[in-house]
Design a protein with these regions (language model features):
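Cross-family detector of peptidyl-prolyl cis-trans isomerase
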Residues: 1-126
């Protein structure tokens, strides 16, 4: 993997006002200057995920003290569509409606039917 040592800290996700979006919303919080992630790439990231409606955190690699590595094509659609184009060193927020996350309510996952907000730091691509 091509990457860098991150000196960033765990992001705080501010509560979101208004109605949940119906499409994926991608916002670059910091633009990186390293290698660019492509569709299906293997990536190394730190992330925080919260529920759009409640603001409650449901997961964070930061809390486990280690980033995670994985191929994008095995992840939720919001990550598959929202990480390509991001550059190493960048921080991006994704707001993923259910069809970009874990599907409609009753889909078998505890987060099915929920709009999710992720802040992702791209540490490496390979």
């Amino acid at each position: 993997m091509t990457g860098l040592i991150s000196n960033k800290t765990k992001p705080e996700i501010e509560p979101t006002l208004g109605d949940a979006p119906t499409e994926l919303v991608i916002t670059d919080l910091e633009v990186g200057d390293g290698a660019e992630a492509t569709a299906g790439a293997n990536v190394d990231v730190h992330y925080v995920g919260v529920d759009f409606e409640t603001g409650e955190q449901f997961d964070a690699s930061w809390d486990r003290g280690a980033s995670i590595q994985f191929p994008l094509n095995g992840l939720i659609k919001g990550w598959q569509d929202g990480i390509p184009g991001m550059k190493v060193g960048g921080r991006r927020q994704l707001i993923c409606p259910p069809q970009y996350a874990y599907g409609p309510a009753g889909g078998g996952h505890r987060l099915s039917g929920r709009t999710l907000v992720f802040v992702i730091d791209l540490l490496a691509v390979g």
